[in-house]
Amino acid sequence: MTPEEYCQQKAASSGSSFYYSFLFLPPNRRRAITALYAYCREVDDVVDECLDPQIAATKLVWWRTELDRLYAGKPEHPVTQALLPVLKEFALPQEQLLEIIDGMEMDLQQTRYLDFKALSLYCYRVASVVGLLAAEIFGYTDRATQKYAHDLGMAFQLTNIIRDVGEDARRGRVYLPIDELQRFNVPVADILNSRYSDNFKALMEFQIERAEQYYAQAMSQLPAADRKAQRPGLVMAAIYRAVLNEIKRDGCQVLSQRTSLTPIRKLWIAWRTWAKG
């Protein structure tokens, strides 16, 4: 299996909405974004799949060293081997790839966030940085597109947090800011024990509204000249906003279920959004 095939398999097997946003890209950009996505999946899987935090931390140290090897032109892992030509073509900075690992380390070090400012740093590292790297691969002419990519990454991660409240709680994680739980009078124990209430629904409606604000802010900052190049992000936004709408329609039942779209619906949204440009 070639490094490119490894990355393709990693992307396709994840079932992620990201995969659908890559489908219509020209081959060189599709290979590049698939390699970047595979890298994100690899370091994310370290945290999700390692039951021992010390082992996970050791593996993340290995990935830091592997990035040094990558930027020295001597990568060992199939994903970084696939990334090597990407670095040369799109000049992706090592600091940003390292920041993604910083975000994963936050998952090993804390399971709660005091306020939205603290959560925003996490979202920046695990999502906005990915958006900024992806924007480089898709291409842009106006630096304002970086602001769009940053806010779109925030919107995506906030959507993930909303969708996965119950799933994360079963792992002992609550990403919703503590001060907001207090404001809406929702005890952490209610989330950890999947106790649904009107207060919890109001809290989640607030979270959804904030995510929507980030989507709107991102779209308002995307320069018209770069809209065509940045269509993969628009595809992702359309899919993720459809998930948010489903969650709202179901009354924010995120403690007991994980809302997702069928592959055919994702494909339809992707095709429709791409065709609209």
Please place each PLM-identified region on the residue numbering:
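Catalytic cores of Mg2+-dependent Asp-rich isoprenoid enzymes
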Residues: 1-157, 162, 166-277
